[in-house]
Amino acid sequence: MGLKVTLIYPGIAGRGWNSLKQGMDAGWISHGLASLSAAAKAEGFDVNLIDLRALSGWDHFREVLAERDPDVIGVTMMSVDYNPARQALAIAKEVKPTVVTVIGGPHVTIALQDSLRIPHVDYLVTGEGEITFPRLLRALAQGERPPYRVLRGEPPDLDAIPFSDRDLFLEEWKKWGYDLDSPEVPFVEELPPPFATIIAGRGCIYNCTFCKPGEDYLFGKRVRRRSVDNVLAELRMLVDRYHLASFM
């Protein structure tokens, strides 16, 4: 549709820059961004990724962002990513003042009032974004600017949305020397590559004090599961596309 969209994964709080393959948490995809990418690409939008874990520092980020020259950037934000996400947003507006900035993810949903105070943010998407984010992109592509900054996500039918766009990460990683023939870094040695993680549902039947309140904010209290046929179809796709040997 002519609109260039760059998604940003700011996950450098743990292992820092140049950290691809430096442990399991530096070799997994963000299913949130991968799902948003799949939904946006299904509607014809040009989507690419900047994964801060693959870069060498903020100057490198500036260079890559200037090369991509996006019309829209989308930043996912967990609370641990708060500082690098803020910095990425500030640099994005510095590099291209006209870029439309969108943030979403767990921190935005759970700490909305705090997120509203983050500078350089045009729109905030709470909850699940597979319906809301492409809708925003369609409006922007038509020259419209939604009047409200906060856009409430709508829970999608999990069998109706596209499978996670793992190539969003894999193609980006390979630009920076990722040479493992696997969509993701295996969790343990007993899970041989090619390896991938799969999300079979949203919400949780348990009541752990650490993550359950956040799950409820993001996905609601009801557990939603994909059908067995839908999960098997994704597994078959992963075997055909990546010769999948193990998954979790």
Predicted regions and their residues:
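Extreme N-terminal starter segment of soluble prokaryotic enzymes
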Residues: 2-5
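Alpha-helix N-cap and loop-to-helix initiation/capping positions
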Residues: 24-28, 128, 222-230
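Glycine-rich beta-alpha loop elements in corrinoid/cobalamin-binding modules
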Residues: 32, 36-165
